[in-house]
Amino acid sequence: GKTKGVTSGLIAFPRL
């Protein structure tokens, strides 16, 4: 899903 992807992405981007 996009909604879940955006939320997880926001936390995954800085972590990467």
UniProtKB/Swiss-Prot annotation:
Lineage top rank: taxon: Eukaryota
Keyword Metal-binding appears in the UniProt entry: no
Residue(s) carrying Leucine amide: L16
UniProt main location, coarse: secreted
GO biological process: neuropeptide signaling pathway
Keywords recorded for this protein, A-Z: Amidation, Neuropeptide, Secreted
Keyword Magnesium among UniProt keywords: no
Localization (cell): Secreted
InterPro entries from the UniProt entry: Periviscerokinin (IPR013231)
A Gene Ontology cellular-component term: extracellular region
Entry similarity comment: Belongs to the periviscerokinin family.
Its biological purpose: Mediates visceral muscle contractile activity (myotropic activity).
Name of the protein described by the UniProt record: Periviscerokinin-3
Organism expressing this protein natively: Mantis religiosa
